[in-house]
Amino acid sequence: MILCSYWHVGLVLLLFSCCGLVLGSEHETRLVANLLENYNKVIRPVEHHTHFVDITVGLQLIQLISVDEVNQIVETNVRLRQQWIDVRLRWNPADYGGIKKIRLPSDDVWLPDLVLYNNADGDFAIVHMTKLLLDYTGKIMWTPPAIFKSYCEIIVTHFPFDQQNCTMKLGIWTYDGTKVSISPESDRPDLSTFMESGEWVMKDYRGWKHWVYYTCCPDTPYLDITYHFIMQRIPLYFVVNVIIPCLLFSFLTGLVFYLPTDSGEKMTLSISVLLSLTVFLLVIVELIPSTSSAVPLIGKYMLFTMIFVISSIIITVVVINTHHRSPSTHTMPQWVRKIFIDTIPNVMFFSTMKRASKEKQENKIFADDIDISDISGKQVTGEVIFQTPLIKNPDVKSAIEGVKYIAEHMKSDEESSNAAEEWKYVAMVIDHILLCVFMLICIIGTVSVFAGRLIELSQEG
């Protein structure tokens, strides 16, 4: 008996609920039918044709999809919040079961033809015709999503440590300011739901309303709202993949001068570095904006690296040529000997060149001034001159002449060898100097290219 009564109560409640739903649906159906019965969506929603429609526009930035530096296009995911009053879509909630808000298809009512003026590659107008929210006062709120591809002039002077000021210019396409007025919802776009980008950081963003007078109709204003977005690039990707490899190429170029010339691999290493750098530049050239308005910082640095490597190859050729010089083809000038053999080694604190002793006493044989030490290989102190009749012996004289010839030939070879060693020593000194100079230029060049811009960014905060 008790179970039966519970069943009846539940059935009654279900019937009342269904009746409420049916009545609510009937009220909404009747309301929509009455509102749209004689509605003309072509005519502006004003009480008198001299009045204007006041539209409030708010831009909600959801995502910065991409920034195409080459084609200078910024792709964004946005929502355009538009509000206005349609005087023909008002009702008394008491006549329709207390309904205060309804949702209507946007295709069934008048819509402002708001477009993106600086569109670059895409749709000028909104293409996703979502439903709009209408309340009993005639106030309409429509927030359609859109993917905008806007033109943005990319200033590449400080790339990749650059800031870009990109704009979105929104305006009514067919109505002038006397027919449809637009005003920004706020002086800043809404970034409350913005998804952070891995490449860009929003530094500042603002919106301004403009009255524009064209030459065709100088007395009629056309209104637009322009949003400015100041974006700063996160340079980590380019630092790791471009700047650091170029810096390593520069250091590797300097190490060419640390490699001994006798190894025969100095030129091989130089050419290998040049080829590697060329291939590397061909790969990364597509990452750099192709514009002739300015040379970006990273382009200057790559040009510096290329000149640096080519200069090292030219100088390496000179060093190798110096290393292989001989006294038969090149006589060392006295100033070269004084600077590169006597002075610079002492200044740079590396070992000086060892030279053969010139304190050799000359020992004469008979009247022909033959050095006894050249013949016997031993130093003889004092001048020993033989004054014997053996000088008249032809065999002895012939033997002495032969020994003298051999001694002079050995002396000539020794002088030639010493001269060649001097050239090699000069080449080694030049290598040491160039190693220090190139490493210093590498560091100074890198700092001079990027330091100024990095200081500016640090001061801006």
Swiss-Prot record:
Catalytic activity of the protein = K(+)(in) = K(+)(out); Na(+)(in) = Na(+)(out)
The topology of this chain with respect to the membrane is: Multi-pass membrane protein
Q: What does this protein do?
A: Upon acetylcholine binding, the AChR responds by an extensive change in conformation that affects all subunits and leads to opening of an ion-conducting channel across the plasma membrane.
Q: Where in the cell is it found?
A: Postsynaptic cell membrane; Cell membrane
What coarse category fits the chief subcellular location reported for this protein?
membrane
Segments spanning the bilayer are 235-259, 267-285, 301-320, 433-451
Quaternary structure (record): Pentamer of two alpha chains, and one each of the beta, delta, and gamma chains.
Outline which residue ranges sit on the Extracellular face: 25-234
Instruction: Tell me where the signal peptide lies.
Output: 1-24
Give the glycosylated residues: N165
Gene that specifies this protein: CHRNA1
Under InterPro entries, the record lists:
Neur_chan_lig-bd, Neur_chan_lig-bd_sf, Neur_channel, Neuro-gated_channel_TM_sf, Neuro_actylchol_rec, Neurotrans-gated_channel_TM, Neurotransmitter_ion_chnl_CS, Nicotinic_acetylcholine_rcpt
Q: Which cysteines are joined by disulfide bonds?
A: C152-C166, C216-C217
Q: Which domain of life is it from?
A: Eukaryota
A single Pfam family it belongs to is Neur_chan_LBD
Task: Quote the SUPFAM superfamilies the UniProt record gives.
Answer: Neurotransmitter-gated ion-channel transmembrane pore, Nicotinic receptor ligand binding domain-like
> Which keywords has UniProt assigned to this entry?
Cell membrane, Disulfide bond, Glycoprotein, Ion channel, Ion transport, Ligand-gated ion channel, Membrane, Postsynaptic cell membrane, Receptor, Signal, Synapse, Transmembrane, Transmembrane helix, Transport
Q: Which family does it belong to?
A: Belongs to the ligand-gated ion channel (TC 1.A.9) family. Acetylcholine receptor (TC 1.A.9.1) subfamily. Alpha-1/CHRNA1 sub-subfamily.
- A single cellular component GO annotation: postsynaptic membrane
List the stretches on the Cytoplasmic face of the membrane.
321-432
Specify the protein name. Answer: Acetylcholine receptor subunit alpha
User: GO terms for molecular function, please?
Assistant: acetylcholine-gated monoatomic cation-selective channel activity; transmembrane signaling receptor activity
